[in-house]
Amino acid sequence: MTSDNLLALKGITKQYKEFRLGPLDLSVPRGYVMGLVGANGAGKTTAIKIALGAVLPGNGSVHLIDKTRVGVVLDRPCWQPGWQVRDLSRLLGPFYSGWNQRVFDELCEWAGVSQRLKVREFSRGMGMKVQVAVALAHGAELLVLDEPTSGLDPLARGELLDKLSEFMTDERHSVLFSTHITTDLDRMADLVTILDAGRVIASGVRDDLLEAWAMVRGGAADLTGELRARIRGLRQHSAGWEGLIAAADLGLCGAGVVADTPSVEDLLVHLAKGRKDA
């Protein structure tokens, strides 16, 4: 994997009254999509604010490429509610030497917004798409997106993910994508970092992480004491049990145990539950 990181967080911590983030190490190499996943309140937005310089960390260091090469898509646009779409190019364009008006106009058509539409009139999907339009119009190399698909209908969500996939056809580009909708990561992410209550519980190449674990299920007679001790996030029900186990421990499973490849959601749910049960 390339050492050409467009963003790198090292040893990041942030202490609030009732919440602590970190220590967090996270890198987004050129040409890769990093998915930052966790439940609401896990610390994803705090991590992104620290990455962008909007919040200072308690400890640690942040490396970020020049901010003129970074495109940001937040939960809600941070522009004045009374601005019209056409005002965005007039007011924001001069800050970027690479601003491309033609690209902006084409992307506004893709977003389905009139140049006269005001920011306060945006639907959630429009707000996300117009932020993407601004980011791509100024030639961003790194897109940082905070929960971009949350609350979108399936059509708008698919259109946004298609545009991000198109963006990633250029090997110079990278994406940091925070979400609690793990199916988005199944489609897009090369790398995954999973947060739970401010702590990293798994991080690495997505496919490697999925291969390192297995979802197992079986009947009550199959759950030996040794196997129980190795299972993360054990769930027991009337039909038997299920949980997550390291692939290296599959030899502990008897013939009645069924093993499957986990999803990112399985890792999030069962590793987080395993921490709480410990």
Residue ranges and their predicted role:
Residues 2-3, 233-278:
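C-terminal coupling/interaction segments
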Residues 9-12, 19-29, 60:
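Conserved beta-strand
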Residues 37-39:
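The feature captures the beta-strand-to-loop junction immediately N-terminal to the Walker
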Residues 42, 154-156:
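Helix N-cap at the start of a conserved alpha-helix in ABC-type nucleotide-binding domains
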Residues 52-53, 57-69:
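Conserved ABC transporter NBD signature motif
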Residues 74-131:
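ABC-family P-loop ATPase nucleotide-binding domains
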Residues 143-147, 152:
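Catalytic Walker B motif of ABC-type/P-loop ATPase nucleotide-binding domains
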Residues 160-245:
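ABC transporter nucleotide-binding domain
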